[in-house]
Regions:
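Non-catalytic structural scaffold of enzyme domains
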Residues: 1-150
Length: 150
């Protein structure tokens, strides 16, 4: 994100922060709207990672992983109303839909396609938490890939 942002917005000030524990928390179900005890754990981790970011006075926070939007409410509460949270997955999906339509590659709406999922973690973990990401997991093959090869 940093490289592209610097190209698109010269002079932009960027504060980056890796949040590696967010992924296992999400995959274990410690997400927005989960039990209060689970949310308490997640809120402690959010504070650990994002206190310096908040203190830096950022005005926009990009949720830079597909897992992070499942923590959006808690992250938003921690960062405060003056910080805009950006979920790039929704924007990317919208642009992909537009591109497919423009090129005549978008499937007709009346046919339901078949899903095949590729994950970088253990496939069984995805199957257990797929409803969190998809709203409703309807099945389909799940294969593990080595993300560093792509």
């Amino acid at each position: 994100y940093e490289k592209l942002l610097r190209q698109l917005v010269p002079g932009v000030e960027i504060t980056a922060q890796a949040c590696p524990l967010f992924v296992p928390l999400v995959e274990a179900g410690y997400v927005d709207h989960s039990e209060e005890s689970r949310q308490q754990v997640t809120k402690l981790v959010i504070a650990q990672y994002l206190t310096e970011v908040r203190e830096a006075g950022v005005d926009t926070l990009i949720l830079g992983c597909t897992h992070y939007p499942l923590l959006k409410t808690m992250i938003g509460e921690f960062m405060g109303q003056s910080v805009t949270l950006v979920d790039p997955a929704k924007t990317a999906a919208h642009h992909l839909e537009q591109m497919l339509s423009e090129r005549g590659l978008k499937a007709a709406q009346e046919h339901e396609g078949q899903a095949h999922f590729y994950v970088s973690d253990v496939p069984d973990s995805f199957v257990q938490t797929a409803d969190l990401f998809l709203g409703e997991y309807k099945g389909g093959p799940v294969d593990q890939i080595a993300i560093d090869k792509y």
